Regions:
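Short loop/turn motifs at secondary-structure junctions and domain boundaries
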Residues: 61, 283-287
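Short, acidic, Ser/Thr-enriched surface-loop or helix-capping motifs
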Residues: 295-298
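A conserved catalytic-core signature of glycosyltransferases
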Residues: 288-290, 316
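Conserved alpha-helical substructure of the radical SAM core
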Residues: 5-6, 10-174, 189, 193, ...
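Processing junctions and N-termini across compartments
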Residues: 69, 73-76, 281, 312, ...
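Flexible mid-to-C-terminal extensions adjoining Fe-S/redox cofactors in radical SAM and related proteins
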Residues: 50-54, 58, 63, 300-301, ...
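Short cysteine clusters
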Residues: 75, 79-82, 287, 304, ...
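Conserved AdoMet/S-adenosylmethionine-binding subsite of the radical SAM
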Residues: 130-276
């Protein structure tokens, strides 16, 4: 039964994403549906919030989450929907590449606690810029035995030194590709660089090689589209380089709305079909993204590996892996102070006007508790502290 449902689901998904009219209708409607669903969820959360006392005993790093190791915060694109070009222009971003010893320490600690998912994607930047990326992928997959190692890339450097082949051969779990569409002119406007051919060739080679190897890796092409989905679906490059390789393991999607990077991105930064996500109502509840700890290239540990406004060295930084373990940092007073601050309306700068906000709720807590039950001693400490 599950197999039949999966196949049916795939056929519906494929039909929508290869039919221009269907895709236009679905993604146009999704904007309004998602806004309705978010409002409903915010109302539900506000009526039955998770208390600090309940959260405290499940606040720390736990295996069902995703650890982010941002191997570099340097990018080779200047996307109009991303904060990277602005923080570089303002010279507020300290860039670098993660040394192998920092990466190894983070991965070893993550493997020791039973972590399943590792994301090599930085808050800003492209992981393929890191010349030591493949060594890190090899270590995480084949020596630390992390089950699900993934990364997001703009595909510009996939062809360099046959990176597309080596990622598949090393056993990467997933490659998520961020690209504009199938129009050179619009690509150059949105991504700010003239690498359309490099990206499209890299995508084609990755999909072709993955298919030849039996599709061991999941590939998802995420169109950050200024064009309507139908314009991309009907384009020659989509028909020649992407559509033939679509399968249950290889999928595409279009962007319903774009977040504002904590207020850094404004409607004037977007173009064409792009729409900005609406600002959520102020809820004094922590965000789920605070619990996906992110290790910066220099070893500093940050709550939230998703967004920044001016820098990734901000008030979301709560420690350094060179000085303390991830477990210690996740249980530290500094980390708890940031999380608990949400309950009194005190938020870090990046979080003040963030449209990516996703509040914790009862279901989230139940899932977290089911895989990481609190010890009696922790409950006693929580009662004493709170």
């Amino acid at each position: 039964m599950n197999s039949l449902l999966r196949k049916l689901s795939w056929r519906i998904y494929h039909a929508v994403h290869t039919n221009g009219l269907a895709a236009d209708v679905v993604y146009w409607s999704a904007f309004y549906f998602q806004n309705f669903w978010r409002r409903r969820n915010y109302r539900r959360v506000s009526q039955n919030t998770v208390s600090p006392e309940e959260l405290w005993e499940h606040r720390h790093l736990e295996p069902s989450a995703t650890l982010v190791t941002g191997v570099t915060n340097i990018c080779n694109a200047k996307c109009s929907f991303c904060a990277y070009p602005k923080v570089v222009a303002n010279k507020t971003l300290q860039t670098g590449i993660m040394p192998f010893d920092v990466f190894k320490r983070a991965v070893d600690e993550w493997a020791a606690v039973g972590g399943h998912s590792l994301d090599l994607t930085p808050v800003v930047g492209d992981p393929l810029v890191d010349p030591g990326l493949l060594e890190k992928v090899d270590y995480a997959v084949n020596q630390a035995h992390i089950k699900n190692v993934v990364l997001t890339t703009n595909a510009i450097l996939l062809n360099r030194n046959d990176t597309y082949k080596r990622l598949i051969d090393l056993g990467i779990g997933g490659v998520f590709i961020s690209t504009q569409g199938a129009s050179r002119e619009v690509y150059e406007k949105v991504y700010g660089v003239k690498h359309y051919d490099d990206a499209m060739s890299g995508i084609r080679n990755l999909l072709e090689y993955n298919r030849a190897k039996g599709e061991p890796s999941r590939v998802v092409i995420r169109f950050r589209n200024a064009e309507k989905p139908s314009q991309i679906i009907h384009s020659k490059d989509f028909a020649d380089n992407i559509k033939p390789y679509l399968s249950e393991q290889v999928r595409i999607n279009f962007t319903v709305d774009f977040d504002n990077w904590g207020g850094t991105i404004q409607p004037t930064d977007l173009s064409g079909f792009m729409r900005l996500r609406k600002l959520p109502p102020p809820l004094n509840v922590p965000c789920q993204n605070l619990f996906n700890f992110a290790v910066r290239h220099d070893g500093r540990v940050r709550l939230c590996g998703c967004r920044l406004t001016r820098s990734d060295l901000d008030d979301l930084v709560v420690g350094n892996i060179r000085e303390k373990s991830l477990e210690e940092i996740s249980k530290s007073d500094q980390a708890w102070s940031v999380i608990k601050g949400f309950y009194s309306g005190k938020r870090p700068e990046t979080c003040l006007e963030c449209t990516f906000y996703n509040p914790i709720d009862r279901r989230w807590l139940e899932r977290r508790a089911s895989v990481n039950p609190a010890l009696p001693a922790e409950k006693q400490v929580a009662t004493a502290i709170l």
